[in-house]
From Swiss-Prot:
Binding site for Mg(2+) 2: D191, E227, E231
KARI C-terminal knotted domain: residues covered: 183-328
GO CC, alphabetical: cytosol
Sequence similarity: Belongs to the ketol-acid reductoisomerase family.
Domain of life: Bacteria
Lineage: Bacteria, Bacillati, Cyanobacteriota, Cyanophyceae, Nostocales
Protein name: Ketol-acid reductoisomerase (NADP(+))
Its EC number(s): 1.1.1.86
Length: 331
């Protein structure tokens, strides 16, 4: 069984007196920067001139510099930008400012694993990837807890890369919950697979198919929305708390029996074969090439798919229903 590492396994002093540059101030960026700052470390934020995030970061008491200046001033550089822009910003702003002994860090292995970013041999290259959104990383830290994280070493130029990665994980609160060691390849391929086959692609397709089946059979769209989308959270919360066993222990016998007897008719061996094909496309780099080319061409297909999905009836029904949910209404 994989070993988890905790606070006592990591030494925060390894980053004491060092300057940590957080490149980007989005969901993960703001959480990492503020948690590291509250851990007593010296943090600066790298943003492009005119970024709307400059005011937010400065209001939080953080020093903001251009990406190039932040990279130049830092010992430890964490890149928390969208995958599709990392290559260009790294090449133009970060790479020219790297020095021997620096740490180049990522929260996802995509660009390193697929060769979009090729670091020099004289820097450490590590990954620290919280397994939760930024707001949760921040909120749990403030509550004295943390979000579990993955960490990995791609290149150990200093001989301390692993310890430095664990130190950073401790600084953002990850070792409070536990951190698991992996590799850039393993994190990248499993993360992409989970997103595509289960969490995003698989779940979205399942929800829409269920909704469409009920509506096409003449049932009210509002009821179809409740049964196929709204109640997903109720089930997922149980699964997260105690696995499939707790979920099944918490639902009715009718629902549990239907789970066992009908579920395998939805996710069949053919479905699993398609999952294996999707995994192969990830492993071979086919998906990465497709995604890179799509972005290089201006995202025409991506934009069209976004527009089409936004016009699905489930979005219209959901918007109207959510407007009536008192607990979702803005104060």
């Amino acid at each position: 069984m994989a070993r988890m590492y905790y606070d006592e396994d990591a030494n925060l002093d390894l980053l004491a007196g060092k300057t940590i540059a957080i490149i980007g101030y989005g969901s993960q960026g703001h959480a990492h920067a503020l948690n590291l700052k509250d851990s007593g470390l010296n943090v600066i934020v790298g943003l492009y001139p005119g970024s709307k995030s400059v005011a937010k970061a400065e209001a939080a008491g953080l020093t903001v510099k251009s990406v190039a200046d932040a990279a130049n001033a830092a010992d430890f550089i964490m890149i928390l930008l969208p995958d599709e822009v990392q290559k260009t910003i790294y090449k133009n702003e970060i790479e020219p400012n790297l020095e021997e002994g620096n740490v180049l860090a990522f929260a996802h292995g995509f660009n390193i694993h697929f060769g979009q970013v090729v670091p020099p041999a004289n820097v450490d290259v590590v990954m620290v990837a919280p397994k939760g959104p930024g707001h949760l990383v921040r909120r749990t830290y403030e509550g004295g807890e943390g979000v579990p994280a993955l960490f990995a070493v791609y290149q150990d130029a200093s001989g301390q890369a692993r310890d430095r990665a664990m130190s950073y994980a401790k600084g953002i609160g990850g070792t409070r919950a536990g951190v698991l060691e992996t590799t850039f390849r393993e994190e990248t391929e499993t993360d992409l697979f989970g997103e595509q086959a289960v969490l995003c692609g698989g779940l979205s397709a399942l929800i829409k198919a269920g909704f469409e089946t009920l509506v096409e059979a003449g049932y009210q769209p509002e009821l179809a929305y409740f049964e196929c989308l709204h109640e997903v959270k109720l089930i997922v919360d149980l699964v997260v708390e105690g696995g499939l066993a707790k979920m099944r222990d918490s639902i009715s016998n009718t629902a549990e029996y239907g789970d066992y007897t009908r579920g395998p008719r939805i996710v069949t061996q053919q479905t699993k074969a398609e999952m294996q094909k999707i995994l192969s496309e990830i492993q071979s780099g086919q998906f990465a090439r497709e995604f890179v080319l799509e972005n290089q061409s201006g995202k025409p297909g991506f934009t069209a798919m976004r527009r089409k999905e936004s016009e699905h009836k489930i979005e219209e029904v959901g918007k109207d229903l959510r407007a009536m949910f008192s607990w979702l209404k803005k104060a």
